[in-house]
Protein backbone atom coordinates (compact mmCIF):
# COMPACT_ATOMS: atom_id res chain seq x y z
CA UNK A 1 0.00 0.00 0.00
CA UNK A 2 1.30 3.39 -0.87
CA UNK A 3 1.88 5.87 1.94
CA UNK A 4 -0.33 8.46 0.25
CA UNK A 5 -3.43 6.21 0.47
CA UNK A 6 -3.71 6.69 4.24
CA UNK A 7 -4.59 10.06 5.73
CA UNK A 8 -1.78 11.53 7.88
CA UNK A 9 -2.35 10.94 11.58
CA UNK A 10 -0.48 10.69 14.88
CA UNK A 11 0.53 7.04 14.53
CA UNK A 12 3.09 5.49 12.19
CA UNK A 13 3.17 1.79 11.39
CA UNK A 14 6.62 0.27 10.86
CA UNK A 15 7.39 -3.13 9.39
CA UNK A 16 10.35 -5.07 8.00
CA UNK A 17 12.01 -4.81 11.41
CA UNK A 18 14.63 -7.35 12.39
CA UNK A 19 12.72 -10.19 14.06
CA UNK A 20 15.79 -11.41 15.96
CA UNK A 21 15.88 -8.32 18.17
CA UNK A 22 14.38 -8.78 21.65
CA UNK A 23 11.23 -6.79 22.38
CA UNK A 24 12.73 -4.64 25.14
CA UNK A 25 15.76 -3.73 23.07
CA UNK A 26 13.58 -3.02 20.03
CA UNK A 27 11.36 -0.64 21.99
CA UNK A 28 14.34 1.22 23.46
CA UNK A 29 15.97 1.53 20.05
CA UNK A 30 12.78 2.77 18.37
CA UNK A 31 12.39 5.21 21.21
CA UNK A 32 15.97 6.38 20.72
CA UNK A 33 15.66 7.07 17.00
CA UNK A 34 12.16 8.57 16.81
CA UNK A 35 11.77 10.87 19.82
CA UNK A 36 13.64 13.76 18.22
CA UNK A 37 10.64 14.31 15.97
CA UNK A 38 8.36 15.13 18.89
CA UNK A 39 6.71 13.79 22.01
CA UNK A 40 5.95 10.09 21.85
CA UNK A 41 2.87 8.86 23.70
CA UNK A 42 3.43 5.15 23.15
CA UNK A 43 5.51 2.57 21.34
CA UNK A 44 3.63 -0.66 20.66
CA UNK A 45 5.36 -3.94 19.90
CA UNK A 46 3.15 -7.00 19.56
CA UNK A 47 3.58 -10.30 21.40
CA UNK A 48 1.71 -12.03 18.60
CA UNK A 49 3.88 -14.27 16.42
CA UNK A 50 2.15 -12.98 13.28
CA UNK A 51 3.08 -9.40 14.16
CA UNK A 52 6.81 -9.90 14.64
CA UNK A 53 8.96 -7.38 12.86
CA UNK A 54 6.24 -4.73 13.20
CA UNK A 55 5.61 -1.83 15.56
CA UNK A 56 3.52 1.31 16.04
CA UNK A 57 4.94 4.64 17.22
CA UNK A 58 2.29 7.04 18.50
CA UNK A 59 3.17 10.74 18.53
CA UNK A 60 1.28 13.51 20.27
CA UNK A 61 1.28 15.62 17.10
CA UNK A 62 0.55 14.56 13.52
CA UNK A 63 3.36 16.82 12.28
CA UNK A 64 5.83 14.78 14.34
CA UNK A 65 4.62 11.55 12.73
CA UNK A 66 4.94 13.13 9.29
CA UNK A 67 8.52 14.29 9.89
CA UNK A 68 9.46 10.88 11.24
CA UNK A 69 7.94 9.07 8.28
CA UNK A 70 9.65 11.26 5.70
CA UNK A 71 13.06 11.27 7.38
CA UNK A 72 13.28 7.61 8.38
CA UNK A 73 11.63 5.89 5.40
CA UNK A 74 13.99 3.14 4.23
CA UNK A 75 16.52 3.83 6.96
CA UNK A 76 18.70 0.76 7.70
CA UNK A 77 17.72 -0.28 11.22
CA UNK A 78 19.49 -3.38 12.54
CA UNK A 79 20.61 -4.07 8.96
CA UNK A 80 17.09 -3.95 7.49
CA UNK A 81 15.47 -0.93 5.79
CA UNK A 82 12.41 0.25 7.69
CA UNK A 83 9.12 0.49 5.81
CA UNK A 84 6.92 3.16 7.34
CA UNK A 85 3.37 4.34 6.69
CA UNK A 86 0.62 6.05 8.62
CA UNK A 87 -1.57 3.75 10.69
CA UNK A 88 -4.91 3.02 9.03
CA UNK A 89 -6.85 4.03 12.15
CA UNK A 90 -6.25 6.06 15.28
CA UNK A 91 -4.70 4.17 18.17
CA UNK A 92 -6.80 3.86 21.33
CA UNK A 93 -4.83 6.56 23.13
CA UNK A 94 -5.40 9.09 20.32
CA UNK A 95 -9.06 8.10 19.97
CA UNK A 96 -9.56 8.77 23.67
CA UNK A 97 -7.94 12.20 23.30
CA UNK A 98 -10.29 12.98 20.39
CA UNK A 99 -13.33 11.57 22.16
CA UNK A 100 -13.91 8.98 19.43
CA UNK A 101 -12.82 5.87 21.34
CA UNK A 102 -15.19 2.88 21.20
CA UNK A 103 -14.64 -0.13 23.48
CA UNK A 104 -14.10 -3.32 21.52
CA UNK A 105 -16.78 -5.99 21.87
CA UNK A 106 -14.58 -8.77 23.26
CA UNK A 107 -17.56 -10.91 24.33
CA UNK A 108 -18.73 -11.16 20.73
CA UNK A 109 -15.26 -12.25 19.65
CA UNK A 110 -15.14 -14.95 22.36
CA UNK A 111 -18.60 -16.21 21.34
CA UNK A 112 -17.41 -16.61 17.76
CA UNK A 113 -14.37 -18.58 18.87
CA UNK A 114 -16.53 -20.96 20.95
CA UNK A 115 -18.94 -21.68 18.10
CA UNK A 116 -16.32 -22.48 15.47
CA UNK A 117 -16.05 -26.20 16.48
CA UNK A 118 -19.87 -26.51 16.32
CA UNK A 119 -19.95 -25.30 12.73
CA UNK A 120 -17.09 -27.58 11.80
CA UNK A 121 -18.90 -30.50 13.46
CA UNK A 122 -22.04 -29.91 11.38
CA UNK A 123 -19.98 -29.76 8.22
CA UNK A 124 -18.20 -33.02 9.05
CA UNK A 125 -21.48 -34.80 9.87
CA UNK A 126 -23.09 -33.73 6.60
CA UNK A 127 -20.52 -33.95 3.79
CA UNK A 128 -21.20 -31.49 1.03
CA UNK A 129 -23.65 -29.46 3.08
CA UNK A 130 -23.24 -25.71 2.71
CA UNK A 131 -22.88 -23.49 5.75
CA UNK A 132 -25.96 -21.46 6.56
CA UNK A 133 -25.74 -17.69 6.07
CA UNK A 134 -25.27 -15.80 9.30
CA UNK A 135 -24.02 -18.75 11.35
CA UNK A 136 -21.51 -17.38 13.92
CA UNK A 137 -17.99 -18.62 13.38
CA UNK A 138 -17.93 -18.65 9.57
CA UNK A 139 -15.68 -15.61 9.58
CA UNK A 140 -13.70 -16.63 12.65
CA UNK A 141 -10.49 -16.76 10.66
CA UNK A 142 -10.81 -13.03 10.11
CA UNK A 143 -10.23 -12.38 13.81
CA UNK A 144 -6.52 -13.06 13.54
CA UNK A 145 -5.92 -10.40 10.92
CA UNK A 146 -3.52 -7.75 12.31
CA UNK A 147 -4.63 -4.16 12.59
CA UNK A 148 -5.21 -1.33 15.00
CA UNK A 149 -8.97 -1.98 15.32
CA UNK A 150 -8.56 -5.64 16.32
CA UNK A 151 -4.99 -5.61 17.50
CA UNK A 152 -3.41 -8.37 19.57
CA UNK A 153 -2.21 -7.43 23.02
CA UNK A 154 0.61 -4.96 22.76
CA UNK A 155 3.62 -4.27 24.91
CA UNK A 156 3.51 -0.76 26.33
CA UNK A 157 6.22 1.88 26.66
CA UNK A 158 6.14 5.51 27.66
CA UNK A 159 8.81 8.06 27.00
CA UNK A 160 11.16 9.14 24.21
CA UNK A 161 14.80 9.89 22.74
CA UNK A 162 16.52 10.87 19.28
CA UNK A 163 17.32 9.18 16.03
CA UNK A 164 19.98 8.61 13.39
CA UNK A 165 19.91 10.60 10.19
CA UNK A 166 21.54 9.39 7.05
CA UNK A 167 25.10 10.72 6.92
CA UNK A 168 25.05 14.43 6.22
CA UNK A 169 21.38 14.90 7.03
CA UNK A 170 20.44 17.60 9.49
CA UNK A 171 17.52 17.52 11.94
CA UNK A 172 14.19 18.89 10.64
CA UNK A 173 13.81 22.69 10.91
CA UNK A 174 13.02 23.74 14.43
CA UNK A 175 13.75 20.29 15.88
CA UNK A 176 16.82 19.95 18.04
CA UNK A 177 17.97 16.43 19.00
CA UNK A 178 15.95 15.25 21.98
CA UNK A 179 13.54 18.20 21.80
CA UNK A 180 9.92 17.48 22.60
CA UNK A 181 6.84 19.69 22.61
CA UNK A 182 5.39 20.54 26.04
CA UNK A 183 3.53 17.54 27.40
CA UNK A 184 1.10 16.95 30.20
CA UNK A 185 3.64 15.98 32.84
CA UNK A 186 3.31 17.58 36.29
CA UNK A 187 5.59 20.48 37.05
CA UNK A 188 9.11 19.35 37.81
CA UNK A 189 8.72 15.92 36.19
CA UNK A 190 10.25 14.98 32.86
CA UNK A 191 9.49 12.08 30.59
CA UNK A 192 12.45 10.08 29.25
CA UNK A 193 13.87 11.91 26.26
CA UNK A 194 13.23 15.40 27.60
CA UNK A 195 16.01 17.81 28.43
CA UNK A 196 16.67 18.43 32.10
CA UNK A 197 17.46 21.98 33.28
CA UNK A 198 21.02 22.90 32.49
CA UNK A 199 23.41 22.33 35.38
CA UNK A 200 26.86 23.90 35.69
CA UNK A 201 29.49 21.43 34.47
CA UNK A 202 33.20 21.82 35.05
CA UNK A 203 34.65 23.04 31.77
CA UNK A 204 37.62 21.52 30.03
CA UNK A 205 39.13 23.07 26.89
CA UNK A 206 37.27 22.11 23.68
CA UNK A 207 38.13 18.64 22.47
CA UNK A 208 36.98 16.38 19.64
CA UNK A 209 36.21 13.73 22.26
CA UNK A 210 33.23 14.06 24.60
CA UNK A 211 33.01 12.55 28.07
CA UNK A 212 29.57 11.30 29.14
CA UNK A 213 28.55 10.71 32.76
CA UNK A 214 25.43 9.75 34.73
CA UNK A 215 24.41 7.10 32.20
CA UNK A 216 21.83 4.47 33.24
CA UNK A 217 22.76 0.84 33.73
CA UNK A 218 21.01 -0.28 30.53
CA UNK A 219 23.11 2.03 28.35
CA UNK A 220 24.86 0.26 25.48
CA UNK A 221 26.98 1.22 22.50
CA UNK A 222 24.10 0.99 20.03
CA UNK A 223 21.89 3.31 22.07
CA UNK A 224 24.58 6.00 22.32
CA UNK A 225 25.49 5.62 18.66
CA UNK A 226 21.87 6.30 17.71
CA UNK A 227 21.90 9.46 19.80
CA UNK A 228 25.14 10.88 18.43
CA UNK A 229 25.23 9.48 14.89
CA UNK A 230 22.84 12.21 13.71
CA UNK A 231 25.56 14.84 14.14
CA UNK A 232 28.13 15.50 11.39
CA UNK A 233 31.62 14.22 12.14
CA UNK A 234 30.55 11.39 14.46
CA UNK A 235 33.18 8.64 14.56
CA UNK A 236 32.57 6.21 17.40
CA UNK A 237 31.37 5.49 20.92
CA UNK A 238 33.77 3.97 23.44
CA UNK A 239 32.45 2.33 26.59
CA UNK A 240 34.57 1.82 29.68
CA UNK A 241 34.86 -1.84 30.78
CA UNK A 242 33.29 -2.36 34.18
CA UNK A 243 31.59 1.05 34.18
CA UNK A 244 28.06 1.47 32.83
CA UNK A 245 27.73 5.12 33.89
CA UNK A 246 30.42 6.72 31.71
CA UNK A 247 31.45 6.67 28.04
CA UNK A 248 33.43 8.59 25.43
CA UNK A 249 32.18 9.81 22.05
CA UNK A 250 34.64 10.85 19.36
CA UNK A 251 34.08 13.33 16.51
CA UNK A 252 36.27 14.52 13.66
CA UNK A 253 36.89 17.92 15.24
CA UNK A 254 36.14 20.11 18.25
CA UNK A 255 33.44 22.17 16.53
CA UNK A 256 31.39 19.10 15.64
CA UNK A 257 31.83 17.67 19.13
CA UNK A 258 30.72 20.98 20.62
CA UNK A 259 27.54 21.05 18.54
CA UNK A 260 26.56 17.57 19.73
CA UNK A 261 27.41 18.47 23.32
CA UNK A 262 25.24 21.58 23.25
CA UNK A 263 22.26 19.77 21.70
CA UNK A 264 22.24 16.70 23.94
CA UNK A 265 23.32 18.25 27.22
CA UNK A 266 20.92 17.11 29.94
CA UNK A 267 19.19 14.57 27.71
CA UNK A 268 17.21 12.10 29.84
CA UNK A 269 17.80 8.56 28.62
CA UNK A 270 15.59 7.36 31.46
CA UNK A 271 13.32 9.10 33.96
CA UNK A 272 16.09 9.30 36.56
CA UNK A 273 19.25 9.72 34.47
CA UNK A 274 20.03 13.08 32.93
CA UNK A 275 23.11 12.69 30.74
CA UNK A 276 25.98 15.06 31.49
CA UNK A 277 28.40 15.87 28.69
CA UNK A 278 31.77 17.58 28.94
CA UNK A 279 34.86 17.79 26.77
CA UNK A 280 37.30 15.01 27.62
CA UNK A 281 40.57 16.07 29.19
CA UNK A 282 43.41 16.34 26.72
Curated annotation (Swiss-Prot):
GO cellular-component term (any): spliceosomal complex
Assigned keywords, A-Z: mRNA processing, mRNA splicing, Nucleus, Repeat, Ribonucleoprotein, RNA-binding, Spliceosome
GO biological process terms held by the UniProt record: mRNA splicing, via spliceosome
Cellular compartments annotated: Nucleus
Molecular function GO labels: U1 snRNA binding
SMART domains membership: RRM
Positions of the RRM domain: 10-89, 208-282
Pfam families documented for this protein: RRM_1
Recorded family membership: Belongs to the RRM U1 A/B'' family.
Subunit field text: U1 snRNP is composed of the 7 core Sm proteins snrpb, snrpd1, snrpd2, snrpd3, snrpe, snrpf and snrpg that assemble in a heptameric protein ring on the Sm site of the small nuclear RNA to form the core snRNP, and at least three U1 snRNP-specific proteins snrnp70/U1-70K, snrpa/U1-A and snrpc/U1-C.
Function: Component of the spliceosomal U1 snRNP, which is essential for recognition of the pre-mRNA 5' splice-site and the subsequent assembly of the spliceosome. U1 snRNP is the first snRNP to interact with pre-mRNA. This interaction is required for the subsequent binding of U2 snRNP and the U4/U6/U5 tri-snRNP. Snrpa binds stem loop II of U1 snRNA.
Name of the protein in question: U1 small nuclear ribonucleoprotein A
Gene name, Swiss-Prot/TrEMBL: snrpa
